[in-house]
């Protein structure tokens, strides 16, 4: 049974969906005013992995992730660029798709946008007002925080301990400093929508509540996002939604850890960020994804060239093992199954599932992958091998790769087996003709491609280096 760490209860719990066999999952998406940095890329990667694993375990997952396409930051960016808000948002939505697609993140089943959900947001606020949870003041609408019993249950903060200021917006029009905005009155020359309270636009927190309700209903199974969203964003989502419906917003809350540079959170505000589209030019996107999954999703992960190079080398070892399995399969005679090895492979699959069942522990699951590669290399060192065993290894690597969203097969730019064989044959001919310069040239070329040649009495054998 899958167990996941529920931020709401601060403990691991067995995962029991609302409807058997089905999962409704929402992940807070980006505010589209700039390109995403590597820290922004972690939530899409880790929750894509969670989604893939739930699917692997037989669940029918409906995955929703939003775009905040109107916001103070987008308006500011549009003014600086001399463009319309919609044009800026659209450009960075396309950039987000490009980056996440490169990182092999599957598209959400739904990608709602704030600007396309405006009627639902306004209706949501109006219903809160009718129930006495919201009030209008000077064209703005605020949520009565103290009226909601249970505020602070996600972040573990008591109302009396919260101080106005810092992360609480201070406004003399509020009945209470802890009240937060649901609707903002329009400012001159700023994009706005008509509402019962006049021209304006929604506050950040209400947007997700309305989009969840519209796309997934009153209560969902899993709500996910970065740790930094726990308070006030997710806390306020709970207050708004549960005040309106009287039902739990989400049964399970998941929060991923930060990506740090020099042990400090990467963020645009601190200026210590690396853009995703820059780093995937320097390293392959699957190396970046693999790197992200080498740490448990709840722990912080330090970002550095050294660690990325380590992930790159590790992924290359796994790919070479798979390539050697494929090569060995092509030259292996069909033999009977070897039960001992098939049992070892089945055991690896069981360990992988156990690790992933334990709060989606991709770090430990990847350790199982390296153990599997070690066993595969030991098996391939034997004089005789079985097609059934080799296929079992390959099938399991493919299964694990689908869950992690990382392919362990060779890329197109790598030499194909047939190309290697052709070069070896050309080298053999060159040696027979005593053209040793050409023979050495081919050996060096293969070495550059990480192909190791071994001259034996039976002829030349080759393998991909580890």
Curated annotation (Swiss-Prot):
A motif ('KMSKS' region) lies at residues 265-269. Keywords: Aminoacyl-tRNA synthetase, ATP-binding, Cytoplasm, Ligase, Metal-binding, Nucleotide-binding, Phosphoprotein, Protein biosynthesis, Zinc. Its cofactor is Zn(2+). It holds the Pfam family CysS_C. Its EC number is 6.1.1.16. GO terms for biological process: cysteinyl-tRNA aminoacylation. Zn(2+) binds at residues 28, 208, 233, 237. It is found in: Cytoplasm. Binds 1 zinc ion per subunit. GO terms for cellular component: cytosol. It comes from the Bacteria. Transmembrane segments: none annotated. It catalyses: tRNA(Cys) + L-cysteine + ATP = L-cysteinyl-tRNA(Cys) + AMP + diphosphate. The modification Phosphoserine is found at residue 269. A motif ('HIGH' region) lies at residues 30-40. One of its GO terms (molecular function) is cysteine-tRNA ligase activity. Coiled coil: none annotated. Monomer. PANTHER family: CYSTEINE--TRNA LIGASE, CYTOPLASMIC (PTHR10890:SF3), CYSTEINYL-TRNA SYNTHETASE (PTHR10890). Belongs to the class-I aminoacyl-tRNA synthetase family. This is Cysteine--tRNA ligase.
């Amino acid at each position: 049974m899958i167990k996941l760490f529920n931020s709401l209860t601060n403990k691991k719990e067995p995962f029991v969906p609302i409807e058997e066999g089905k999962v409704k999952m929402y992940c807070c998406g980006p505010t589209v005013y700039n390109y995403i940095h590597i820290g922004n890329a972690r939530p899409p990667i880790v929750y894509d992995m969670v989604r893939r694993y739930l699917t692997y375990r037989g669940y029918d997952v409906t995955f929703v992730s939003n775009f905040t396409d109107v916001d103070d930051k987008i308006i500011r960016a549009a003014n600086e660029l001399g463009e319309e808000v919609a044009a800026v948002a659209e450009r960075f939505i396309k950039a987000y798709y490009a980056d996440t697609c490169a990182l092999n993140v599957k598209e959400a089943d739904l990608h709602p946008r704030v600007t396309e959900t405006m009627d639902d947001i306004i209706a949501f606020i109006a219903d809160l007002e009718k129930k006495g949870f919201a009030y209008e003041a000077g064209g703005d609408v605020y949520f009565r925080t103290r009226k909601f019993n249970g505020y602070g249950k996600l972040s573990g903060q008591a109302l009396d301990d919260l101080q106005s200021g810092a992360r609480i917006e201070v406004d003399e029009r509020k009945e209470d400093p802890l009240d937060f905005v649901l609707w903002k009155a329009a400012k001159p020359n700023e994009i706005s929508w008509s509402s019962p309270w006049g021209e304006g636009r929604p506050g950040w927190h209400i947007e997700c509540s309305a989009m969840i309700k519209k796309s997934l209903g009153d209560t969902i199974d899993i709500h996910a996002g970065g740790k930094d969203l726990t308070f006030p964003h997710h806390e306020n989502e709970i207050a708004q939604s549960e005040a309106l419906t009287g039902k739990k917003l989400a049964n399970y809350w998941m929060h991923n850890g930060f990506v740090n540079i020099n042990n400090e959170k990467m963020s645009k505000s601190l200026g210590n960020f690396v853009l995703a589209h820059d780093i995937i030019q320097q390293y392959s996107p699957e190396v970046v994804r693999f790197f992200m999954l080498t740490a448990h999703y709840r722990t912080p992960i330090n970002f550095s060239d050294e660690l990325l190079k380590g992930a790159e080398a590790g992924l290359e070892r796994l790919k070479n093992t798979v390539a050697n399995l494929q090569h060995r399969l092509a030259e292996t005679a069909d033999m009977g199954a070897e039960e001992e090895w098939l049992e070892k492979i089945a055991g690896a699959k069981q360990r992988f599932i156990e690790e992933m069942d334990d709060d989606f522990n991709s770090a430990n699951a990847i350790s199982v992958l390296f153990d599997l590669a070690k066993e595969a290399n030991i098996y391939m060192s034997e004089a005789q091998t079985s097609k059934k065993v080799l296929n079992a290894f390959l099938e399991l690597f493919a299964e694990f790769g689908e869950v992690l969203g990382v392919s362990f097969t060779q890329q197109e730019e790598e030499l194909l087996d047939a190309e290697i064989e052709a070069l070896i044959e050309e080298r053999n001919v060159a040696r027979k003709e005593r053209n040793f310069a050409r023979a050495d040239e081919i050996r060096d070329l293969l070495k550059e491609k990480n192909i190791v040649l071994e001259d034996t009495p039976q002829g030349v054998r080759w393998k991909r280096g580890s």
